[in-house]
UniProtKB/Swiss-Prot annotation:
GO biological process terms held by the UniProt record: methylation; rRNA processing
NCBIfam families hit by this protein: PRK11760.1
Residues the record lists as binding S-adenosyl-L-methionine: 187, 220-223, 239, 259, 276
Enzyme Commission code: 2.1.1.186
Major place of residence: cytoplasm
GO cellular component terms given for this protein: cytoplasm
Source organism of the structure: Aeromonas hydrophila subsp. hydrophila (strain ATCC 7966 / DSM 30187 / BCRC 13018 / CCUG 14551 / JCM 1027 / KCTC 2358 / NCIMB 9240 / NCTC 8049)
Reaction(s) this enzyme catalyzes, per UniProt: cytidine(2498) in 23S rRNA + S-adenosyl-L-methionine = 2'-O-methylcytidine(2498) in 23S rRNA + S-adenosyl-L-homocysteine + H(+)
Active site residues of this protein: 305 (proton acceptor)
The name this protein goes by in its record: Ribosomal RNA large subunit methyltransferase M
General function of this protein: Catalyzes the 2'-O-methylation at nucleotide C2498 in 23S rRNA.
Cross-referenced Pfam families: FtsJ, RlmM_FDX, RLMM_N
Top-level division of the source organism's lineage: Bacteria
Disulfide bonds: none
Amino acid sequence: MNNLLLYCRPGFEKEAAAEITERASNMQCYGFARVKDDSGYVIFELYDEEQADLLARKLPFRELIFIRQMLVVTHELKDLDLSDRITPILEATQGYAICGDLRVETADTNEAKELSAFCRKFTVPLRQALRGNELLTKKETPHRPVFHAFFLANDHVLLGYSYSFNNSEFHMGIPRLRCPADAPSRSSLKLEEAFYVFVPREEWDMRLTSGMKAVDLGACPGGWTYQLVRRGMMVTAVDNGMMAQSLMDTGQVKHIRDDGFVWRPSKKNTYWLVCDMVDKPARVTHMIADWFRESDCQEAMFNLKLPMKKRYAEAVHNIEVLRELLKEIDNAFVIQAKQLYHDREEITVHVYNKYWVSKLSAKE
């Protein structure tokens, strides 16, 4: 049994299934997806089992939109003896290469959350047993595969592994963030998560630094502006609504009452453009391309709201449209997109120009 296990947002299993089916077939890897609505995961069964490992290594995880985590499943163990779950796990995985990390996980559903406490408690004895059997390094080792135990019930587990160079670094594929007490809205967490997912941590001091100028379109009440302000940026917040007074009191925010689709900066000194406006994805996509065409920003983070039907097709279509529009400007643009944990019926898209980022690096 060598299949792919893919974590996703509950309710988006069909989108994850469509995505893995298309991306795998593009690599001449064929199979079918087993989908259970609202389960928070998809199993992709390959006709050639050896191709599961190939996809786990070669299909770029960062390019996947609706998939939070990707791993190879090698064994499914059911009806485990509750007094000794560890022995059958060790027996099943004797052929594994030594792994550098262990993740005992479950699905991101209300039902599965009841297993979360068990998973935490079970991690310690399982880690000790794996190390004792030379299946896990004595210390966490970033460049080794990750050992996954994905529990569907306390006596039912899927065992597998992912590659640390091509997976999500986060437990269950979810960054653990807390909404700051002084943030104007919980939407603030969307942008914070986007920074964690899209911008390498070692580049934060260069690309998310104090003194940068940023624009937040559709800013009110200021959830996204808050994330920029806390990093020391000077922010122009564009919205006809009211901004949180706590943000205005920082002296870092200039509030312009205008339509975010219409307003443009008078100077070409904006680095970040962020946007969480509710509108048709096509309109937002073309607006973002226009900002780059006019050199009104150098890096952007924005959300695309998805329709109720054909969500995967709509997401892919708009990203392809954006890619073609940006190619007319420069071939150095990079587009990343993900349905983040804090996103709902939407995806977050990140755009930057490799050449412009390299110039920032040169200044360092």
